[in-house]
Swiss-Prot record:
InterPro entries registered for this protein in UniProt: Ribosomal_bS21 (IPR001911)
Keywords: Ribonucleoprotein, Ribosomal protein
One GO molecular-function entry: structural constituent of ribosome
Pfam families, alphabetized: Ribosomal_S21
The protein's name: Small ribosomal subunit protein bS21
This protein's encoding gene: rpsU
GO annotation terms (biological process): translation
GO terms for cellular component: ribonucleoprotein complex; ribosome
Family, similarity comment: Belongs to the bacterial ribosomal protein bS21 family.
Length: 64
């Protein structure tokens, strides 16, 4: 059966934070889980992914 999280009654935000903590401990990355993220977290994740893509593209460039 599923994991039981102790949260205050009706506190959805806290429940989502606890679920995200649990998933990250299991090695499920933020990009792969489909649960609510704060807008600032989304912006940060997208910025990190963009920087990673740019870095990969720079490594692929062939110096001639």
């Amino acid at each position: 059966m599923g994991q039981v999280f102790m949260v205050h009654h009706g506190d959805v935000e806290q429940a989502l934070r606890r679920l995200k903590q649990h998933l990250s401990r299991e090695g499920i990355t933020p990009g792969r889980k489909r649960i609510f993220e704060k807008p600032s977290e989304k912006r940060h994740r997208r910025a990190v992914e963009t920087r990673r893509k740019i870095r990969k593209q720079k490594l692929r460039v062939v110096p001639y």
